[in-house]
Amino acid sequence: MSKKAIKGYINLIIPAAGATPAPPIGPALGQRKVNIAAFCKDFNDATNGMEKGVPLPTVITVYEDSSFSFKVKTPPASYFLKKYAKITKGSSATKKEAMVGKVTIDDCREIAKLKISDLNTKNIEAATKIICGSAASMGLEVVGN
């Protein structure tokens, strides 16, 4: 049995159980002649058990026959960091000028455990450092050892 020929990939961030034919999903899929309603139904069914509105990076593989498959990844690190720090948005200023909140190193380690499948490392300590770097870029102070 031969594999289907891949026409392309679409990378989108879609809210959990919130796929609709409206932009950006509809136009992105429509350009590649994918059945938009079928994708929205399949995606919403696949993410139905998750908290509504959680942003999910999704990679949609489009095949030559206009069929598709998709892979849902874990939410972005910034989503978890904002949740742990109890803030709605990161700092718009440079790192040292305006810290908008605090997270502990243990919080970063917990996030790293959730995100390790999507990071470019399998070492939990390296993954923790990646998450701490994201926190610093958002204007969050990392406290603890």
Swiss-Prot record:
GO terms for cellular component: cytosolic large ribosomal subunit. It comes from Rickettsia prowazekii (strain Madrid E). Forms part of the ribosomal stalk which helps the ribosome interact with GTP-bound translation factors. GO terms for biological process: translation. PROSITE patterns: RIBOSOMAL_L11 (PS00359). This is Large ribosomal subunit protein uL11. CDD domains: Ribosomal_L11 (cd00349). Keywords: Methylation, Ribonucleoprotein, Ribosomal protein, RNA-binding, rRNA-binding. Belongs to the universal ribosomal protein uL11 family. The keyword RNA-binding applies. Part of the ribosomal stalk of the 50S ribosomal subunit. Interacts with L10 and the large rRNA to form the base of the stalk. L10 forms an elongated spine to which L12 dimers bind in a sequential fashion forming a multimeric L10(L12)X complex. One of its GO terms (molecular function) is large ribosomal subunit rRNA binding. One or more lysine residues are methylated. InterPro entries: Ribosomal_uL11 (IPR000911), Ribosomal_uL11_bac-typ (IPR006519), Ribosomal_uL11_C (IPR020783), Ribosomal_uL11_C_sf (IPR036769), Ribosomal_uL11_CS (IPR020785), Ribosomal_uL11_N (IPR020784), Ribosomal_uL11_N_sf (IPR036796). NCBIfam families: L11_bact (TIGR01632).
